[in-house]
Amino acid sequence: MSKDSPLIALVAGEISGDILGAGLINALKIHYPNARFIGVAGPQMIQAGCQTLFDMEELAVMGLAEVVKHLPRLLKRRKQVIQTMLQQQPDIFIGIDAPDFNLTIEQKLKAKGITTIHYVSPSVWAWRQDRIHKIKRATNLVLAFLPFEKAFYDRFNVACRFIGHTMADAIALKPNRTEACQILNIDENQRYLAILAGSRASEVDFLAEPFLKAALLLKQKYPDLQCLVPLVNQQRIQQFEQIKARVAPSLPVKILKGNARQAMIAADATLLASGTAALEAMLCKSPMVVGYKLKPTSYWLAKRLIKTKYISLPNLLADDMLVPELIQDECNPENLAWYLGNYLADDIDNKKQQNELKQRFTDLHKMIQCDADSKAAQAVIDLLANSDDQ
């Protein structure tokens, strides 16, 4: 490559990957103003200067049934990416998340001498740990958001760099509740519970009912309690409203399209499904209860596959049960309301415990707030420099 104008390939498969890719491209352009970027990009990466082979939306399929339905097209697109990369011979290939799509591409390209990075570790530390061997074959380096992920890769001698989490960079160490309430157009003197029942239809199906019934129980004890319900799109809003009409028609709720972050900052407590939302709640310093339910067969399988003590990212980061995790049968209205009630109570002991919890959240926030875009860019620069020297 020309030292100051590398050809850098990136493939993102969904919106979150597009955001990461754009941040990385912008950070790389500081060091390489003349770099060229090609691959599969969404609107933000395109705006940052990446030429895309096809619309990223073609890869954004979720759930087994949807993947199976679109499999011939996905395989065709993957073959197209591999062929294009072998023709173009980029100086480095960066697969952003989407491991089922990207790892095979990375493996094929690495075998042909192209340097590869996988950006965002798959949850290989939690389940399907045998994937570590494919990751080792496929990548020159993994970029990990969380420190315990790097520790896992180190055990298997897989090159990995901890870069911190982009979400920790985006959220202030001391979130501004007044500003969040203004954005949501709500009274900051009111008591709020944020309810996040998940982004997938199946999650809302399983969790909306126990979450709403828990809120009804809390409303009896705290009549001034208001519920904030951020949902990702119009389909989830309609689905949630139908369930609410059946199980909690009298409960006053403010339904929001998006604005989950502001809802969690404004809320006195958050009730949520496990996943990235739990990490976001921690960064928002929102005391939370994590609830999750699956089909009985899926739960039976998950129990046997998942290898970690905890399921929520705050607890995994702390290696401690910082926040309650109520799974399957334990995820019932009475349990959820009892744990949430501890956060809403006004007595001195509970306030002290809340302050201690928020301090733990702040300490964890600092641990993963590392300017991830710059760290990721530096990892790319270092690998390019190494390949130049060889």
Swiss-Prot record:
Disulfide bond positions: none
GO cellular component: membrane
EC number assigned by the record: 2.4.1.182
GO-annotated biological processes: lipid A biosynthetic process
Catalyzed reaction equations: a lipid X + a UDP-2-N,3-O-bis[(3R)-3-hydroxyacyl]-alpha-D-glucosamine = a lipid A disaccharide + UDP + H(+)
Pathway: Bacterial outer membrane biogenesis; LPS lipid A biosynthesis
GO MF term list: lipid-A-disaccharide synthase activity; phospholipid binding
NCBIfam families listed in its UniProt record: lpxB
Functional note: Condensation of UDP-2,3-diacylglucosamine and 2,3-diacylglucosamine-1-phosphate to form lipid A disaccharide, a precursor of lipid A, a phosphorylated glycolipid that anchors the lipopolysaccharide to the outer membrane of the cell.
Assigned protein family: Belongs to the LpxB family.
Protein name in UniProt: Lipid-A-disaccharide synthase
